[in-house]
């Protein structure tokens, strides 16, 4: 009996594929995503309508597929190394609690960033702090939302223990690590969200650059998703670049983020330990457990600059490409603390000025002091 059913399915499958393809044969985005029978998706890379699961013929990743009419006007996002470097510097500024404006002035002088607010709050029972800031550049027509990474080894341990003992918390339509959500909400609800809303109201055409390193990148992910979900700014204006980001939430959160934030880039150094946290044993599970959102940009060994060898990771599993960072086994804290020759957590000690005389072991020293 079972063999008869299986044989019938095999015979019927090609016909079903043809029928499904028929409903996803529209020639424009609006008609494609408005299909009444199948959730077709439009790919701007080949300007064609595709059926769900058509991995072999659809050149777009999940993050690039368009399934909603409101996104048909979205431009196909591209990884921008120059913008990535700017975002990294802005992430490094977040570590400066005392003089962030001076760091902004020195790191990107021509942008003339104006600091709007800096928020620091205790984000766990051990008294560890989370921090973030909002700034604006009228020269670049950009609003910056940046979050600081962990500043002490005890905070990293608190995050690790929290991920093991505390269930994930609901966030929008998915679930995320409780520590990330708690830190984000304490900062966001204090004044960051209100400041962003005020700036967007005055400058509706400005892009919103959301960024962070390590713990800060997890909170930046939540911020970008929140901005898009609640329509605080047009989705096309929201840009996320993160550096050494841990897994923020589960598969549902990753899927929602990919659908909401089209211009999202998760920059990862080879051998960086933190993107492997929280741990995944075996193959990433789409039904339970932590799962990365897209799009990973993987820098190979000795990436001393933003233009070093790198590639966008479109392999399988989606967002957990087994040929990119998920394949790395020799993990390193130093590769986490240093991106593009910038010791992210301690760069503020130079007042965010690049110096040729910086010691080669500055990144390692940064880790020893807990600045990672």
Task: Identify the function of each model-found stretch.
Residues 2-21:
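Cleavable N-terminal signal peptides of Sec/SRP-targeted secreted and luminal proteins
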Residues 11, 35, 63-110:
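Charged, compositionally biased non-catalytic regions
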Residues 23-29:
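Disulfide-bonded cysteine-rich modules in secreted/extracellular proteins
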Residues 31-62, 67:
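Extracellular Cys-Trp
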Residues 43, 93, 137, 146-150, ...:
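Structured beta-strand/turn binding interfaces of compact recognition modules in eukaryotic regulators
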Residues 99, 105-211, 229-237, 260-262, ...:
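A conserved cap/lid and substrate-binding interface adjacent to the catalytic center
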Residues 141, 186-211, 225-372:
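Serine hydrolase/lipase
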Residues 212-216, 220:
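Gly/Ala-rich beta-loop-alpha elbow adjacent to hydrolase catalytic centers
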């Amino acid at each position: 009996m079972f063999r008869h059913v299986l044989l019938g399915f095999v015979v019927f499958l090609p016909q079903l594929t043809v029928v499904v393809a028929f409903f996803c044969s529209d020639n424009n985005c609006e008609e494609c995503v408005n299909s009444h029978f199948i959730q077709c998706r439009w790919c701007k890379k080949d300007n064609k309508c595709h059926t769900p699961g058509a991995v072999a013929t659809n050149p777009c990743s999940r993050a690039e597929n368009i399934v909603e009419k409101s996104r048909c006007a979205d431009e196909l996002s591209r990884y921008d190394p120059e913008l990535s470097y700017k975002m990294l510097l802005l992430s490094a500024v977040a570590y400066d609690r005392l003089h962030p404006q001076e760091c902004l002035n020195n790191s990107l002088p021509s942008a003339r960033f104006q600091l709007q607010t800096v928020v620091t709050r205790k984000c766990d029972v051990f008294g560890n702090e989370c921090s973030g800031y909002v700034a604006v550049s009228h020269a670049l027509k950009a609003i910056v939302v940046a979050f600081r990474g962990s500043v002490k080894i005890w905070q990293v341990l608190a995050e690790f223990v929290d991920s093991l003992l505390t269930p994930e918390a609901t966030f929008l339509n998915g679930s995320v690590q409780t520590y990330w959500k708690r830190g984000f909400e304490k900062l966001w609800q204090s004044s960051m969200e209100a400041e962003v809303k005020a700036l967007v109201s005055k400058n509706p055409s400005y892009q919103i650059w959301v960024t962070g390193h390590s713990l800060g990148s997890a909170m930046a992910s939540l911020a970008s998703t929140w901005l898009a979900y609640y329509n605080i700014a047009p989705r096309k204006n929201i840009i996320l670049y993160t550096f050494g980001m841990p897994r923020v939430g589960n598969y549902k959160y990753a899927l929602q983020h990919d659908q909401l934030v089209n211009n999202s880039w998760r920059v990862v150094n080879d051998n960086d330990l933190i993107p492997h946290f929280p741990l995944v044993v075996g193959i990433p599970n789409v039904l339970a457990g932590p799962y990365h959102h897209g799009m990973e940009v993987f820098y190979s060994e000795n990436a001393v600059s933003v233009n070093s060898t790198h590639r966008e990771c479109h392999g399988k599993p989606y967002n957990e490409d087994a040929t990119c960072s998920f394949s790395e086994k020799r993990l390193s804290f130093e590769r986490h603390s240093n991106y593009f020759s910038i010791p992210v957590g301690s760069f503020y000690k130079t007042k965010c000025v690049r110096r040729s005389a910086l010691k080669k072991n500055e990144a390692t020293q940064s880790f020893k002091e807990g600045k990672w």
